[in-house]
Amino acid sequence: MVTQTKNYETGVVRPEPVITPPTELRVPHLGGTARFVHPSQGPNAYGAVGKAILEAGQAVPTGDYTASLLAGAYLGTNRDEPEFKNVRELMISRWLWVFNRNLWIPEGVYSIEDQESLGRSQPLNVNDLENMLKGGKDFNGIRFSQDGRTSFAPKGSYKLGEHTPESLAKDGFVIANYGVEGAEKLGEVVSTFGRNPKTFGVEVAEGNEPELRVSAVD
């Protein structure tokens, strides 16, 4: 018996790809408005995410801007919008890179905005940081440069580990990274979590070399 195999021509209708333009999220920020682009870059390493943001012609989110974004996502009147829900999902599933470089020394921690996404690729020098802080302002012992981009929190002004929302908002390390207003916003944000937040850093012993780290929040 001869069996014939019939060839059937099947056609698959492929829909045209839908290109969704980026959505702009606007949140209150330091008396004005900050704008963020959705969808976000990543997931990827700190440097890769920063590079992608900069190549897109955008600015990387430093601590104060990140605090404003989170306040919008958790506390804002538009927090039920899909884009803000996505921010909360990222906080649960991964983390958000915060483009600040932190240099830990025995006496405390320096924080400087990482607007070029250098991360740990280039060292920071204590003398250079001190020069940046000259002529700046002081808030409860935490020093800020005139432009607000560099800060120093002395040991004793911060505690690494578990916090209450209230203690987080007053923590020197948090204030150095996110600013006074940003730290207050983070305190309000974490009060919605149902669990106490934790901060992580480096304890550098006397006589040891400084330790350079970057920031993230989750």
Question: Where in this protein do the model-derived segments appear?
Answer:
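A binding-site-centric feature that preferentially detects glycan-recognition modules on secreted/surface proteins
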Residues: 1-59, 65-218
